[in-house]
Structure formats: structure tokens, C-alpha cells
Amino acid sequence: MVASARVQKLVRRYKLAIATALAILLLQGLVVWSFSGLEEDEPGEKGRQRKPRPLDPGEGSKDTDSSAGRRGSAGRRHGRWRGRAESPGVPVAKVVRAVTSRQRASRRVPPAPPPEAPGRQNLSGAAAGEALIGAPGFPQHGDTGSVEGAPQPTDNTFTPKCEIVGKDALSALARASTKQCQQEIANVVCLHQAGNLMPKSVPRHCQLAGKMSPGVQWEEIRAQQPVGGPPVRIAYMLVVHGRAIRQLKRLLKAVYHEQHFFYIHVDKRSNYLYREVVELAQHYENVRVTPWRMVTIWGGASLLRMYLRSMKDLLEIPGWTWDFFINLSATDYPTRTNEELVAFLSKNRDKNFLKSHGRDNSRFIKKQGLDRLFHECDSHMWRLGERQIPAGIVVDGGSDWFVLTRSFVEYVVYTDDPLVAQLRQFYTYTLLPAESFFHTVLENSPACASLVDNNLRVTNWNRKLGCKCQYKHIVDWCGCSPNDFKPQDFLRLQQVSRPTFFARKFESTVNQEVLEILDFHLYGSYPPSTPALKAYWENIYDVADGPGGLSDVLLTAYTAFARLSLRHAATAVSPLATAVCRFEPRGLPSSVHLYFYDDHFQGYLVTQAVQPSAQGPAETLEMWLMPQRSLKLLGHSDQASRLQSLEVGTEWDPKERLFRNFGGLLGPLDEPVAMQRWARGPNLTATVVWIDPTYVVATSYDITVDADTEVTQYKPPLSLPLRPGAWTVRLLQFWEPLGETRFLVLPLTFNRKLPLRKDDASWLHAGPPHNEYMEQSFQGLSGILNLPQAEALEEAARRHTELTGSALEAWTDGELSNFWSVAGLCAIGPSACPSLELCRLTSWSSLSPDPKSELGPVKADGRLR
């Protein structure tokens, strides 16, 4: 009775608050209902809205040698300003100060779609699932992984053929960005709900019970014994993407032999790499490029389709009589010589080498998502619901890097065995199908006894760093990726207990020294006078790609780099030579390269066509822009000495713990991250303060750094646009400085690839409304931080919002010159300017000699290296 009276009293006291809460809930319900349609995002959002994540939370971490980790854990929809505080692989940086995140309602699909309108055609021509049943495992018109590439144009409506009720399917329909993809998803789900998509059972032909897991040991003495019969010949399938042509050439140089065959598939999105590979292949009869290309996304069914089609090609190329199929990526490298590999495979010429996950099948099935239905479209793998594993077979899987015999490849490609046909159908709708398809087919086939549980690779797995759900933007699941090898990992490359012939991953932009060590271990050192052994170049823009791949920030920066360099050329020579060394840029830069030396980023190399101001023919110059160091380490105590570096950038890679935006170029609409590196030492709590160019304190937050923390990083949810100019990030302990760095928010001279107009500049360069970067104001800290009065800076910032044309370029160039310097210029051809050296004679130009990545003619021993 007393409790009831107390409840009534509380209700009377807080009835207004309760009524308000109920009203808010009602309003939220109306908002969610209003978003339940499938209309596209409004164009006024300028493309900055993010798609909602998968719906339910995940489970567990990843199995050995399998890339699937756990179910997508980003199911709850976060607002566009949601920040993160995390320290990959080390204790999490704890954000002590509260920051408010904004949330938007996610869209949903009505649970009962209307019936199909009479006479209306399916967007994909035929139901996606029906077409795939007719030809399982082969690309269909409009598939992401098909030769034709992106989905075909269609009308703006789609009509499900059934009532779609599963939450995964409804979530996928709400998030798919094209109507064709929505139609494909609906078709697949309806077929699955009707029981007409997945095989119920699959025949098993293996006469052995249970899982096959024999191993083969590496014996150095036995490997050197003579081989009975002719040595095996290998078909290497190189699956590549990106722009790292020099690393690909280095790999090909290491594995090449004239007795082997090399078939290269370049992702359809990697046009620069494709052009380079086509040119490379023209010089070697046993190197070919697939005449078709697919978009192969991580975890997608398109990767398996690509492998199956490549295998068929390799079987049908006249004169290519190979014995083993080995797939490699551009981030692989051999760990033993070709002679050792050929000798080993010749002794085991009837074996298929695939790495299995282990003994716990049920755990693997759950973590790999094999009991879930997936479909690939819009360059995304959509989770559509649950399914049953077919009865009658043993399901296996692990790594999607393998060594297969020709006879097994022929069986997979040509057989009409229901085992293969039905498993193709099953794996068409499977996440990471290449990690399980070949394992499962082999383990249930008549050749099951040929399985060896070893894929002859060593992979640099670091679960704490590699399993960060880094692929959740392209797949509704949490995946893992191996880390790059570094010199400290070299002992792992020298496997002695089991045969390993390849290792992954290697990235020259992350660490090239480990490749030098491995290359020396295999083939000996280059002559002492060999140039560029510690240098690495990687193209990031080529004029043949068109400006579409460039952001406004990069377009602004590259053109400004060219102007700065040409002014430098005109002022760096004697007065008598000034006239012939004065140039004007012609058009946009023709190429841009990243330049590294001794595993340190050295800057950008910009190639630009120019016209001499004096009479003379047009020339092409390459310009080296080097970043200027802006870090100051200020602390002297034991705790303060822990700070090693403080950086601000974008494209943070939690696996390798670096910024993939190597030059740190960012603009007003970017969302920067502050990262700190620490030495081991006593625990400490530090305060991070962000200050904009007009001394507005944008934000402040605390981070806790434990004794063994190595890296902390956090992206504050700042309101956009950021004010252009020089920003400062200070790191303090008890308000005493530990360190400070400056970074540039670049004023843009382009917007949507066109010169910036005044009406765009008025908001793009003005900073956030009312100078409020956060809902909470931190301007009260200006006194503690001893910030000066900023009236003059505020007035200058206001005037900058009115700039366009040459005045805007002058402001941009001035800001950029405070953070970048011209380190070199060279001429690609003859130049009238006497101070310009030929690029091929320099040590830094992208046109200078690079013997380690140059292929050359085949040697007498059949090799290139």
C-alpha cells in the first residue's frame, strides 16, 4: 500500500516529464514511419550521409586461416557525427569528456510489399535466383562480379514477388542503393522463402569417414633428392587490384620461370594497373592477362566466379600444359626458391594443398556465416537471413589461397557431377565462398584422399589488430585481414617444421625493408652500386583515369603544388636565366606519385605539362613536394617523455596503425583523426585540445594511457565545414604541455571538379554556424591556454569566404607553402632552363632507374631474378 502511494506521488510529481517523453516517443515513431519508404537520399546532403549498418550484433572472433570474423556488430544506426575512441591492439583510449552524437532515423521497408503489377518486367531481366539456378556459379548479367560490371540501367520501381518478413532481408532492401539490387535481393529472398533456392542435400563420393587432415613435413635433405619423372609446371593465377605496379613486378620477377605460366586478373576498378599489366605481358609469351575483368569485392561471390572462369581459361589456352594451379596476390612473396618448390610438388604431384580451419566444424560454420544467406550486388555482400547446410556432406574451409592439381581443376570446371553443380549453387549465395568451396568439393569428392591440410603459405595474422570489422562497409559481417610483415617478423618467414613457399602480406608503402631482407635471403644481394634499393614509388593519379577519381581536396592540392613549383623554378636561378625558366601550367597534372625512401614518406611527385613564358615548345616537368615537420615535443617528466609522436590525418588504418592518406591532405568537409604514439611507462591521463585558425577552441577531451599502450587515436565529432587554415592540436597533462602539432585544412579552389564559385565559398570556407564545432562550447579554455585575441583573424577569415579565382588560388598557395616545400624539379625531356636536370638522371624522380622492380629479358637459367 505504501509502495502504491509512493508510485502515485511520483506520477503526480513527474506527470509533465512523462507526458513529454511519451510525446517524443510518438514523434520518433512518426519519423521512423516517414522513412519507411525506399526513396533515395536528397541531393542537398551532398553525399555525406552514411548508409545504416547491419541490424544485429555479432559474436566471437576469427578462426585460424579464415577471413570471416563474426556477424556484423554495427547493427545499431549511428549518427553521422558519431566518433570513436580506440587503440587497436592495446588498451582503448578512454574519452572522459562527454560528447553528444547526433542520430538519424534509418529507413525501413514495409513488411508487406504490394503484389507485382501486371505486365511489369523484373529489373534484372530475370529473377536473380532463377537465373543462377539455371547456370550455377557463372556470372549473370548485371552482377557486380560479372564481366559487364555494374548493374544495368532500369526503371525506378521494384516489386517483390512475395511478402518479405525477415529482418535481415528488410534491412538489406532498405540499404541497397539501386532498384536493380533491391529487385535481385527480393527475388533471392522469395526463392529462398519458397524453398527453391538452396539444395536440401548433396551427394558425397568420398569413401573415407570424417574430415581429411593429413600433413606433409618439410625435409631439407629429401627436398634436394632427384625427382622421378619430369618436373612439374605451374600455372600462377595472379589476382591483383590497386595501383602498386612496382610491387607486382617485383613479385613476378621473383617467381618467374620460363617453364611456368602466369595468368593475371586485374580488378575492373583498377584501370591504371590494368594498362600497366597489359604492357608488361606483351614482353613474355607465358604471361597473359584475362581478356575479361570483374569487380571482385572482399568476401564476395564474384571472387569464386572469377577463379572458376580463370581455371577454365587456363585449361583451354593452347600449349599451356601445366600440372598445378597456384593463386597469388600482389601482396604475396616467395619464401623459398623456384627449384625447391618444383622439387617439392614433383614429389607430391597427386596432392591438393588447402589449409583447413581445424576440427570444430560447427564453430567454423557459425563464424564463417555458412548458415546465413548472402547475395552480392551494388558492390556489397548483403546478409538476407538464415539457411540450412545441405545434408549428406562434410563442410570444410579455411584459407582461400591454395595449390590444386590440374586433374582436380578439370573436375571442378568440367564435371556434371551433382556434387559440384549443387555446391556451386550453394556457394553462389555464400560469404567468402573461395575460403570453403574448393575445400568442401575436394573433401566430398572421389579424390578426397589427395587433400593435404597445408596451403604452403605463412600468413602474418595478428588478431588484435586484424579483426576490426574493417570490411563492414562492403559486407554485412565482421571480417579479418592479415597484417603486413615487418623486419621483426622475419623469423616467422623461415618455417622449418612444415613446407611453406609463399608468405603474405607485404606492402611497400608500409614496409619495404622486409622485402629486401627476404629477397637477399633467397637470391643474394644486388651489386653495391645498385640505385633505388631503399626507394619506392606508387602512382596515385594518372591522366588516363580522368579527374573523376580525384576529390576536390586532391585536385586543389595537386594544382597548387604545380603553381608553387613553377614559382620556385623561376626564382631559384640566376637573373639571366629567369626568362627561360618561367613556365605556366597547361591543364591539370598528368600524374602524381607517392615517394618513399627508407620506409619514410618523402612527399608527392607531380608531373605537369608546362608552357615556357618565353618562346619555345611545351615541356613536361616533374616536381617533388616534401612535407615540413610540424611536431613539437614539449614535456620533460617521465610521464611526458612517453609521447613519441602526435599526428592528425584521415583514412586511419587500425590494422597497420597508420594514416593511409600519407600526405595528410584534407579539406573543410573531412573528419580528421588525432593519433598519438607512446613509449611504455607510467599510466597517465592527457588532455587533447583542438584549436582552429581563429583561435576558436573546437573541442577538448581526455585520454587515459595505460602502461603498455602504444597507440591512441580518436576522431572528435566536429561540426562541418571546418574553417580552412592552420589548425593546432595540443596535448597536455594537468594543463602543462606535452606536445603540439599543426595541420592544414586546405582552402578549396574546386567544388565538384569545377572552379569554386562565390556562393559555394561563402559556406564552404566559413566554418561551422556560430563557430560551434560541438554542441558544448570549449571557448572557456582560451584563458587557460593563453590564446590571443582573434578579432583581426576573424575579420580576415570573413574576407576569405568571398575569395574566388586567382585571389583564392593565392590564399591556397600561401597556406600550402607553410606546410610543404619544393624539394626538386626535373625535366622529362630536353629543357631550355639550365637548372632543370633530366628526370631519369635524378635519384628521386618516378622516372629514375629502379632495378629491383624492372623485369628485363629472360636469363639463361629461365629466370628474371
From Swiss-Prot:
Checking InterPro entries in the record gives: Glyco_trans_14 (IPR003406), XYLT (IPR043538), XylT_C (IPR024448)
- Cystine links in this protein are C162-C190, C206-C448, C467-C480, C469-C478, C581-C833, C826-C839
- Tell whether RNA-binding is among the UniProt keywords: no
Q: In which tissues is it expressed?
A: Detected in brain, liver, lung, kidney, heart, spleen and testis, and at lower levels in skeletal muscle.
What residue ranges lie in the Cytoplasmic compartment?
1-15
Enumerate composition-biased segments (Basic residues): 73-82
One term under GO cellular component: extracellular space
User: Topologically, how does it sit relative to the membrane?
Assistant: Single-pass type II membrane protein
Parts of the chain on the Lumenal side? 37-865
Q: What is its EC number?
A: 2.4.2.26
Glycosylated positions are N122, N327, N683
Q: Note one Pfam family from the annotation.
A: Branch
GO molecular function, a single term = magnesium ion binding
Binding residues for UDP-alpha-D-xylose: V239, D267, T296, I297, W298, D400, W401, S481, R504, K505
Q: What happens when the gene is disrupted?
A: Mutant mice are born at the expected Mendelian rate. Their livers display strongly reduced levels of heparan sulfate proteoglycan. DCN glycosylation is altered and lacks chondroitin sulfate groups. After 3 to 5 months, all mutant mice display increased liver weight. At an age of 4 to 5 months, about half of them delevop liver cysts, due to biliary epithelial cell hyperplasia. At an age of 3 and 10 months, mutant mice also display increased kidney weight due to hydronephrosis and impaired renal function, but they do not develop cysts.
Q: What parts of the sequence cross the membrane?
A: 16-36
Q: Any idea which UniProt keywords this protein has?
A: Disulfide bond, Glycoprotein, Glycosyltransferase, Golgi apparatus, Magnesium, Manganese, Membrane, Metal-binding, Secreted, Signal-anchor, Transferase, Transmembrane, Transmembrane helix
Query: In which compartments does the protein localize?
Result: Golgi apparatus membrane; Secreted
**Single biological process term from Gene Ontology:** chondroitin sulfate proteoglycan biosynthetic process
First-level EC class:
transferase
Stretches of Basic and acidic residues bias are at 53-65
What the protein does comes down to:
Catalyzes the first step in the biosynthesis of chondroitin sulfate, heparan sulfate and dermatan sulfate proteoglycans, such as DCN. Transfers D-xylose from UDP-D-xylose to specific serine residues of the core protein.
Entry similarity comment:
Belongs to the glycosyltransferase 14 family. XylT subfamily.
What is the protein name given in its UniProt record? Xylosyltransferase 2
What are the leading ranks of the lineage?
Answer: Eukaryota, Metazoa, Chordata, Craniata, Vertebrata
